Amino acid sequence: VFRAGIWKPRTRPGYFEGVGSLALQWMKKVKLETGMLTTTEVANPNHIDLALKNEIDILWVGARTTVNPFIIQEIAEALRGTEKIVLIKNPINPDLSLWLGAIERFYSSNIKNIGAIHRGFSTYEKTKYRNNPEWQITIDLQRKLPDLPLILDPSHMAGRRDLIFDLCQTALDLNYDGFMIETHNDPDNAWSDSKQQITPDSLKQLTQNLKVRRATNDDDFYLETLNGLRAQIDVHDNKLINTLGNRMKVAEKIGLLKKKNNVAIFQSKRWNEILANMLLEGEEKKLSEEFILKFFKAIHQESINHQENIIKKD
């Protein structure tokens, strides 16, 4: 499939926003000369009307559109009953319900050929990616919609061409169905997102180097070993849940003590000490800083919730 952004919604005005409907004739030429299917982003009913009249094969809805249920509903109504393939990118913010809601609106408009595009999520925390993967969100999406085709957009996720291959390999290992990768004959001079573009030759090399793994293996030794290791995981998970439950009981006792002594729930000095210690412990156990921060922030929030419940009781 040949992908091109005809209309390019940008975060801020003044940047290249695509050449507009003029490019629809170029897409027709691409299809005629290569035999490839064509796809572009649509953001309103007018885009849809022009794309359909010019025989664009696949339409995708961008991340900035997915966040708005009103616009999604307008687009779904404009496409009602179409047999075209419609791909929905994840919303900018890491909100599975918002993504699911957009997909459901297209299903409700009698559109059957639907897929999802994972392009990563914006975050205040600095990471090496332009948009953080948050793989767990797409794992949850696959669990809720197991038959929904899922495509990775490593270009927008990475923001840098040197990170694209590893993201693609991870996606394959997580049973993704394909990729949407930006290519350019002269990436450094591309009019938009030049750092994330790769050449067609680089794309060919990338696809040749990717390893497609089997979904499973029926070998008896493999299955026996796997089941044994999974049993160990189950034991550790149960211990983890019990430990967390016991930790919350201690947090409740602390909450009761604070209530009796009229002390605020949140103690920033203590929280900073916990984080610093756990980051050191995590590093020794080869756990990433990102994981430790997310894990203990979640634990801390749950502890606060338990203490608040204690303090609110008469």
Residue positions per predicted region:
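Catalytic alpha/beta core domains of metabolic enzymes, predominantly
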Residues: 71-205, 209, 215-221
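Alpha-helix N-cap and loop-to-helix initiation/capping positions
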Residues: 15-23, 63, 67, 94, ...
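Receiver (REC) domain switch/active-site residues of two-component response regulators
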Residues: 56-57, 177, 237
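Glycine-rich, proline-tolerant flexible connector loops at the mouths of alpha/beta enzymes
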Residues: 3-21, 185-194, 254-265
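Domain-level signature for soluble enzymes in the chorismate/prephenate branch of the shikimate pathway
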Residues: 215-314
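Catalytic beta/alpha-barrel core
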Residues: 3, 17-19, 35-44, 57-71, ...
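Active-site mouth loops of central-metabolism enzymes
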Residues: 12-17, 37-42, 62-63, 94, ...
